[in-house]
């Protein structure tokens, strides 16, 4: 079940409040205006957008809004309910045969679980089922990585463009040393671009990338539990034994101890 992840906007609002309070407590409300500079903001955001446009093809950039939306949604998968589902399927398969699960499998809404069960019902062996399902997981992980990479690179570019703006401001300041009226505005550009770049990186792009990565790990975890459940049903494992296995396996700490299959660039697979 998908629900609104309120912690994402709460984090943004909380970070903004902390910055604003820090500024006001040091210089008052009137001093807050000193931290607003359109030129500095334009240098950072404009340069950041240019760098991102150069780095990614249009097809990846078009997906960015939908990927960003995932940071505001949390998927609530109840592992206990999932275990109960597999226990029920296993019990039914042992009593009436694996083929009797066909109707139940086709009614399942989760496409990953549905596909795995249909493979088992169609008579595919354990090794093939595991290979197909692991390939599905790897493909999903790669899609998520590509979507997340836009925000990861933006988090890298933002501080760099902040530094570029700082250099621009310093050059302008040194060029106008004879004009005292220009020292303040140019110094503001030099310092505020660094501030804006750091804020965009550490309060927007990097946290979003981190949240997207955590969501990917959670989804992989759920799918790994599904794979083990499907294999258990396919092999005719005793429902109680399958339940005991999945209860242990469904602990994230235990799952992280399992050897992971790592796919290299050449296509070979080895355990890490």
Curated annotation (Swiss-Prot):
Entry's Gene Ontology BP terms: bacterial-type flagellum-dependent swarming motility; chemotaxis
Pfam families reported for this sequence: MotA_ExbB
Biological role stated in the UniProt entry: May be involved in some transport function.
Organism (species): Bacillus subtilis (strain 168)
Claim: Cytoplasm is one of the keywords in the record: no
Membrane topology label: Multi-pass membrane protein
Places the protein is found: Cell membrane
Stretches of the chain forming a coiled coil according to its record: none
Cytoplasmic topological domain residue ranges: 209-272
Chief location of this protein within or outside the cell: membrane
TM stretches of this protein: 9-29, 38-58, 154-174, 188-208
Entry similarity comment: Belongs to the MotA family.
Protein's recorded name: Uncharacterized protein YtxD
Gene Ontology CC, one term: plasma membrane
Classification via InterPro entries: Flag_MotA_CS, MotA-like, MotA_ExbB_proton_chnl
PANTHER family listed in its UniProt record: CHEMOTAXIS PROTEIN MOTA (PTHR30433), MOTILITY PROTEIN A (PTHR30433:SF2)
Keyword field: Cell membrane, Membrane, Transmembrane, Transmembrane helix, Transport
